[in-house]
Curated annotation (Swiss-Prot):
Catalyzes the GTP-dependent ribosomal translocation step during translation elongation. During this step, the ribosome changes from the pre-translocational (PRE) to the post-translocational (POST) state as the newly formed A-site-bound peptidyl-tRNA and P-site-bound deacylated tRNA move to the P and E sites, respectively. Catalyzes the coordinated movement of the two tRNA molecules, the mRNA and conformational changes in the ribosome. This is Elongation factor G 1. Disulfide bonds: none annotated. Residues 8-290 form the tr-type G domain. Belongs to the TRAFAC class translation factor GTPase superfamily. Classic translation factor GTPase family. EF-G/EF-2 subfamily. NCBIfam families: EF-G, PRK12740.1-5, small_GTP. It is found in: Cytoplasm. PANTHER family: RIBOSOME-RELEASING FACTOR 2, MITOCHONDRIAL, TRANSLATION ELONGATION FACTOR G-RELATED. GO terms for cellular component: cytoplasm. GTP binds at residues 17-24, 88-92, 142-145.
């Protein structure tokens, strides 16, 4: 089968924003204008096409990043047909992992901001992630029809708070109730959309007289930004003082793809104005798969290599999301980076080194699906019938294995015990939790060995609440949930050198003998665990060294202070001895474990607690209350900012253990007028009195 759309006309984009910027509505309008979706779904009624899980519709927030394919020929039908794959990303901070994983497979992003609220805390998180993956982006200022809407204020905030370099390519005509349309600064014409046709028809008219000066000023800034893309354009601009439309678009496109600037547009998705022009900007300024650097990976021999976005290359793809579908079972969303694959082909899951047959391939449109026979470089599709694949796995041609760069998932910071209500729920719960953990790598399930309870861990209270809710709806499991518990960790302050562990049992017959000497050091924050083999002269035979490592790793799970996992330590195995007959793997595993426990005791162990970055938006009158309360929760105030349209943003670092039930007390402190967001920042040493209380509670 030949390719329907040339790869140069593909755009793999994400629509990203904070809650309530109107992202889902914006996506809906995109689907409507691209002709996929003939009746507009509204979030207000809980009927939006992209939000396809029941809880998303109830809560009106987007949780799952669904992928949809749409086609666009320009709002005036003036482009050849382009294929736009849209990955919807959630806006709530507990779902940052979803944003992160979709950023990995995007080529470009459209950041949606509220014209009233401007840049919110979550916008900063998303922006940082887009920077991390070097994702070219556009800014779309939505809700221009709302009271307090101010396009230029958002422009200032993008520069100040995000250190962005926005370049407006349109200027709004009016604002709030008087918002009529936009002036296209490239064409220097006003665009007025026809309300009767829900914005599918529009007219170019002359720029309103009162806006001419403003438009000239902003056009000059835009042309200058385009001219800076290369020397030839700069010289032409300096000589002629002007550039052609094509040169402006080319200059802005090159700089957008290089992540130097962000074209900025505006509109109101709800009132059907502006999204159409934004879609044209996606075609004009965001990259196709061939405009960005080829994906890199490792071959079997560990050599680094790259795969170009071309059908002639060997097949490689990345599984970026797993979903359970009530009709077809497990769906694996994957992005094809190179080559072609057909349904029925055998693939290699290079991450797990397992071969699997690709069953059916589905092209997703929000919650509808169409079966297709093949996918090519640049495509995003869903596979049915892959049993082994999980998020972040590389799928490739078995004859040409490659492992693409893996995604890194954060460690959970909050845990809860969960118990089935009846015996019948017990079995179903295990199945449901495993299925959910497979879908979401930032959600973990384990059994507490002492109490036998099932413990679930995740990125925040809302995260766990939604997963327990899904268990009930999708798997019919009724469960009771315990109080949230903080995921404390243990580490060391000092080093401990030459600590030995000796496991000897000799009581006639075959005995046990293992002897290991280690040095324990603190490694840098977030590094985890590191094992170094420094054995010389075969004092411990090669085959027993992994057993020492294994024994230490088992002991890491439960530290010496209060049984919390140990992090950020480096163990060097320096010496030991063995017995020809009595030594075995188990003896060295025990020796490693004993040496590590003793080394931990000597190395001044400390308790670490998760610190959260908290941002509170509050009217100025309550500022003192909010700050006093945060300080009372052992919070460290990091700074304050003014909000668009009055009010203050207070930024603080607060221990997670002090933040339970915060939303209730914030409501009473501020008469329900303040809001807050919270995300995990890092682990920090717990103060002595706090640590002692936690340790005594745990060791009672």
């Amino acid at each position: 089968m030949a390719r329907k759309t040339p790869i140069e006309r593909y755009r793999n984009i994400g629509i990203s924003a904070h809650i309530d910027a109107g992202k889902t509505t914006t996506t809906e309008r995109i689907l409507f204008y691209t002709g996929v979706n003939h009746k507009i779904g509204e979030v207000h009624d809980g009927a939006a096409t992209m939000d396809w899980m029941e809880q998303e519709q109830e809560r009106g927030i987007t949780i799952t990043s669904a992928a949809t394919t749409a086609f666009w020929k320009g709002m005036g039908g003036n482009y050849p047909e382009h294929r736009i794959n849209i990955i919807d990303t959630p806006g709530h901070v507990d779902f940052t992992i979803e944003v992160e994983r979709s950023m990995r497979v995007l080529d470009g992003a459209c950041m949606v901001y509220c014209a009233v609220g401007g840049v919110q805390p979550q916008s900063e998180t998303v922006w940082r992630q887009a920077n991390k993956y070097k994702v070219p982006r556009l800014a779309f200022v939505n809700k221009m029809d709302r009271t307090g809407a101010n396009f230029f204020k958002v422009y200032d905030q993008l520069r100040l708070r995000l250190k962005a370099n926005p370049v407006p390519v349109v200027v709004p005509i009016g604002a709030e109730e008087g918002f009529k349309g936009v002036v296209d600064l490239i064409k220097m014409k006003a665009i007025i959309w026809d309300e009767a046709s829900q914005g599918t028809k529009f007219d170019y008219v002359d720029i309103p007289a009162e806006l001419v000066d403003t438009c000239n000023e902003w056009r000059e800034k835009m042309v200058e930004a385009a001219a800076e893309s290369n020397e030839d354009l700069m010289n032409k601009y300096l000589e002629a003082g002007e550039l052609s439309e094509a040169e402006i678009v080319k200059g802005l496109r090159d700089r957008t793809i290089a992540c130097e600037i962000q074209p900025m547009l505006c509109g109101t998705a709800f009132k059907n104005k502006g999204v159409q022009r934004m879609l044209d900007a996606v075609i004009d300024f965001l990259p196709s798969p061939v405009d960005i650097p080829p994906v890199t990976g490792e071959l079997e021999n560990g050599e680094k290599t790259e795969r170009r976005a071309s059908d002639d290359e060997k097949f490689s793809a990345l599984a970026f999301k797993i979903m359970t579908d009530p009709f077809v079972g497990q769906l694996i969303f994957f992005r094809v980076y190179s080559g072609v694959v057909n349904s029925g082909d055998t693939l290699l899951n290079a991450t797990k080194d397992k071969k699997e047959r690709l069953g059916r391939i589905l092209q997703m449109h929000a919650n509808q699906r169409e079966e297709i026979k093949e996918v090519r470089a640049g495509d995003i599709a869903a596979a049915v019938g892959l049993k082994e694949a999980t998020t972040g796995d590389t799928l490739c041609d078995p004859a040409h294995p490659i492992v693409l760069e893996r995604m890194i998932f954060p460690e959970p910071v909050i845990s809860q015990a969960v118990e089935p209500k009846t015996k019948a729920d017990q079995e179903k719960m295990g199945l449901a939790l495993n299925r959910l953990a497979q879908e979401d790598p930032s959600f973990r399930v384990q059994t507490d060995e002492e109490s036998g309870q099932t413990i679930i861990s995740g990125m925040g209270e809302l995260h766990l609440e939604i997963l327990v809710d899904r268990m009930k709806r999708e798997f019919g499991v009724e469960a009771t949930v315990g109080k949230p518990q903080v995921a404390y960790r243990e580490t060391i302050r000092k080093s401990a050198a030459d600590v030995e562990g000796k496991f000897v049992k000799q009581s006639g017959g075959r005995g046990q003998y293992g002897h290991a000497v280690i040095t324990l050091e603190r490694s840098e924050l977030g590094k985890g665990y590191e094992f170094v083999d420094a054995i010389k002269g075969g004092v411990i035979p090669r085959e027993y060294i992994p057993s020492v490592d294994k024994g230490i790793q088992e002991t890491l799970k439960s530290g010496v202070l209060a049984g919390f996992p140990v992090v950020d330590v480096k163990v060097t195995l320096t010496f030991g001895s063995y017995h020809d007959v009595d030594s075995n793997e188990n003896a060295f595993r025990m020796a490693g474990s004993m040496a590590f426990k003793e080394a931990m005791r000597r190395a001044d162990p400390v308790l670490l607690e998760p610190m959260m970055a908290v941002e509170v938006e509050t009217p100025e009158d309550f500022m003192g209350n909010v700050m006093g309360d945060l300080s009372g929760r052992r919070g460290i105030i990091q700074g304050m900012d003014d909000m668009v349209g009055g009010g203050k943003i207070v930024r603080a670092e607060v221990p997670l253990s002090e933040m339970f039930g915060y939303s209730t007390s914030l409501r009473s402190l501020t008469q329900g007028r303040a809001t807050y967001t919270m995300e995990f920042k890092h682990y920090a040493e717990a103060p002595k009195n706090v640590a002692e209380a936690i340790i005594s509670a745990k060791t009672k």
